[in-house]
Amino acid sequence: MKALIVYAHPEPKSFNGAMKDLAVETLRGRGDEVEVTDLYAMRFKAVVGADDFHGERANPEFLSIAAEQTRACETGTLASDIVAEQKKLARAEILILQFPIWWFGMPAILKGWVDRVLARGFAYVADASMTQACCAERPL
């Protein structure tokens, strides 16, 4: 099995860090392939914005994230950090999100990963069929 672990904690020696390390050790011990994205270590940009989209915009007068994500996925003009994470996700058969609960939810850096990487046109499409998205053939 190919696993992607997205880890979101600023302290590697934390309980969350230990849980991530144990997951890596356990999965590799069974012969699984494991890839880890450490959002804090890579200083992942957590804010969606116009700089996520290169090339001609769908609407240069108004920033619609959904429209720009769709266009950028169709034209291959997403920011390189997003594309790199999408490639990791496309290779994975299982996704593990390792994070602490802060203020009743995930850390902002992980929410930013979800917002930017699970882009419209990549992880889902606007119609109900879900037949066009890369991840349409498997549940997320």
For each of these PLM feature ranges, what is it?
Residues V125-S129:
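A gly/proline- and charged-residue-enriched helix-loop-helix capping module
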Residues I94, P139-L140:
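Conserved catalytic-site loops of classical short-chain dehydrogenases/reductases
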Residues M1-F99, F104-F122:
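N-terminal beta1-alpha1-beta2 submodule of the flavodoxin-like/Rossmannoid cofactor-binding fold
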Residues Q132-R138:
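Short, conserved loop/helix-junction motifs that constitute active-site signature segments
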